[in-house]
Amino acid sequence: MKTNFHTHTYRCGHAVGTERDYVAAAAQAGCELLGMSDHTPWPVPGVGMQAGELGDYVAELKQLRGEYAGKLELKIGLECEYWAENMNWLRDQIAEHGIDYIIMGSHFGNVRGERAYFGAVTDRDGLRSYLDHTVAGLETGMYSYLAHPELCLRAYPQWDKAAEDTCRQLARACRDLNVPVEYNLEGLRANRKGNHPGLGYPYRRFWDIAAEEGCIAAIGYDAHMPETLLDDTDFEMARRLIENELGMKRIETIF
């Protein structure tokens, strides 16, 4: 692993370890460029840091950036949802805190007029809502890549025309907008453990389509434990799949 841009901390409420723990693990693993990207503290309820934590998160990472200068390059990022009514707020936070980048994690949106988790959708309406919501977010031009692009397949029960159409339209949008798609290693670990109730993600047919449509790929550890960064087995498997089997262009860095 030379680079990783999908890294969480305890602040999001569903990961363990401090910023220092992850940076130390990355340095031990020989990482050259690490991006920290914990979940944004939105002004609406959801998964993410608590309100007021963003300043501490950034301050700690700036301290670590100085400590590890010459050993590891550290970028300060966030994994962000897309909430149309709050994007000006997000732009202000990025400017105020000097955030280097954001990646899109499209977890939540509206399905049939109600807020829903896209990783739990099981019907065509859910797939369509995920597609429309995610593409609208990407069209803002704010996101450096799309994390776990096929999250909508996590609980979806079968590969059918609706699933294929959704994946193809999403892949085409990412290609046309020049937004890389992430092969998500946290999802891969969950697949292995049987933790996805449906097709799951990463899902091979999505990646076949992404290759056919000319998407650019990234690999993200989506680390929720520092020790995840110490094992490159899944990274190497993903790299071989993307580069050798699928013949896709893979980026090492978003900078």
Tell where the protein language model's regions lie, with residue ranges:
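Aromatic- and acidic-residue-enriched segments that line the glycan-binding/catalytic groove
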Residues: 91-94, 99, 196
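Short glycine-enriched, charge-decorated loop/helix-capping segments at active-site entrances
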Residues: 47-51, 117-122, 196-197
